[in-house]
Amino acid sequence: GPFCPSLLRPFLLRIFGSQVGRGVLIRRGVKVHFPWNLEIGNTCWIGEEVWFINHERIVVGSDVCISQGAIICSGGHNYRSVSLEFQHKPIQIKDGAWVCLDAKVLPGVTIGECSVVSAGEIVRKSVPDYSMLIVGEILPIDPPK
């Protein structure tokens, strides 16, 4: 909630089974469905109103930024089934990646090392290391110096 300091949130997630590294800042309004299915590395920044829908494991590497309003969703329903049964796959966001404002990461996706998912993107397939997903296209980017 609004009265829970950002540096206290990692501690609370650990109590409920998350693995959270050192130097992690979690802003207000972040939602985590199943804390025991969330792992966050060191020195990460999780922006306001980020939503981890983690029916399956979500692993966030170190030095990752997940910007405001992003949704990281490891499960959904099989629309081809009359009963809409649930189907889920794990998600990995590797070290140094940046998931920008209002991006949506779907089940089974890996975001590569030091890669960028641009604002508003819907990530349906994995993004390789040192790449940028922008307007649905994956472009190579230089490694950080």
Show which residues each predicted segment covers.
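Extended, small-residue-rich solenoid/repeat segments and analogous flexible loops
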Residues: 1-33
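Conserved acidic
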Residues: 4, 8, 16, 36, ...
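Left-handed beta-helix
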Residues: 22, 27-28, 33-34, 41-42, ...
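A short acidic, helix-capping loop that chelates divalent metal ions and anchors anionic groups
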Residues: 79-82
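Extended, positively charged loop/linker patches that create polyanion-binding surfaces
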Residues: 84-86
